[in-house]
Each structure stands twice: as structure tokens, then as C-alpha cells.
Amino acid sequence: MKLKKSFLNHCKKKNLEINPNQLELVDHLNKFYNLNFNKSFLKKIFYNKNTKPGFYLQGAVGVGKTMILNFFYENFKFSKQRIHFNEFMISFHNFKFKNKKNKKENIIEQFVKKLKKNYELIYFDEFQVTNIVDAMILGNLFKKIFNENIKVLFSSNIKINDLYKDGLQRDQFLPFIKILKDKCFQEKLIIEEDYRKSQSDKNKRFFYPLDSTTNFKVNKFYRQITK
């Protein structure tokens, strides 16, 4: 997947500002794709013990994390599902209710096998855990999901260690946190401004230090004053 080139073209067509931190994230997503889906790449490395089936992106509101993960998702050509986490858990509980009489196999295993049959990638946008019922089963559920080698994208405002913080019986939730940390590449997107509430840099007199971020701001400033 030549994600970076496609992303640059996408930003150019949409007249979107390109931030170096966002470009770095695109590179990490491209690596995630190559490690998990690029067969020619996999043949070259044969086996990479650093390969992980999950990608957890944390960042504040408005930094563009959803835009970038959505772009990755739209360019992903295999079977996939984008779903809100609460909706996903409702689908699990509905499945559990409908299949409660089936004692031949564990309900979680049945549910995950169904996922495996339909999807190679699942994308949870704005992931968070607030429900104690969900919190208590996530460890077993995602252990099965990752064991089936289903790839998972997470977008969240919350870092992994702070998920379900101060929640009831949180000690029983901690195995899920360990699973996420073991099975996911962890990235944090840091942007100084909220693109949905961006303010002009016209009042700035100088930019420092001289790095890629500063270069981005100077280019943005130039575009603003030459409109």
C-alpha cells in the first residue's frame, strides 16, 4: 500500500493542510499494513516477531486522527467493518442472547468465528469503555479476536493505561489493558491546534525552533497572507 502518496494527493485535492506529525502517522499505518497484509513483503521477512495485529491511536479531540484512520480504512481493499464500540458490544450481547441454548461451544468463540468469517479488519472509532458489563468480558473477547488474527484499529482520546479509569472492579479489567499493550502498535498523534477550531497565526512575529513543524507553520502562514 502506497498510503503516503495517496494521502498527499488526497490532501492536495481537498486543499487540506499537511502536518508532519500526521505524515509520520501515515507512515506507521503503512508499516502496519505491510506487516499484516502485504504478502510479498511478508515473504521477504518470512517472520517478524514484532508484527502485531492491532493499531491503537490516541490523540486529543480535533488533531485529525479520525480523518487519517478513515483514509486508511477507505483504502483498505480487504473485508472490513467500521463500527462504534457500543454498537459492537450490543451486537455481541444480541448474539449471546440468540445463541444461549447452544452449549456446544463457548459463546465468545462462536461470536469471534463469525467475525473471522466476515472481516479481516475491524475499526473502532473513538474507543472508550464505560460499561461494567462490557469491561468484565473484554479481556476474553479480544484475546479470542487477536488469537484468530483479526486485525483491529482503535481511535481514542484516552491512552490505554487510562481506559475504564476509576471504574468498578477495574482490577478485573486490567488483563484487557495488558492484551492491548501486547497486541497493538501504540501511536499518539500530537498537534498543537484543533483543526476544527483552528485560529490564525497572523499575529506571530517569529517561529521557533527550526524543524519540520515550524516549516509547516510558516507555509500555513504564507498561504494565509497570500490569499
Model-derived regions, located:
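AAA+/P-loop NTPase substrate/partner-engagement loops
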Residues: 75-106, 110, 114
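Pre-Walker A (Motif I) flank of P-loop NTPase domains
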Residues: 48-57, 120
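Conserved lysine of the Walker
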Residues: 65
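Conserved P-loop NTPase "ATPase switch" module shared by AAA+ and STAND
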Residues: 115-132
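Walker A (P-loop) phosphate-binding loop of P-loop NTPases
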Residues: 62
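N-terminal pre-Walker A segment at the start of P-loop NTPase domains
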Residues: 15-46
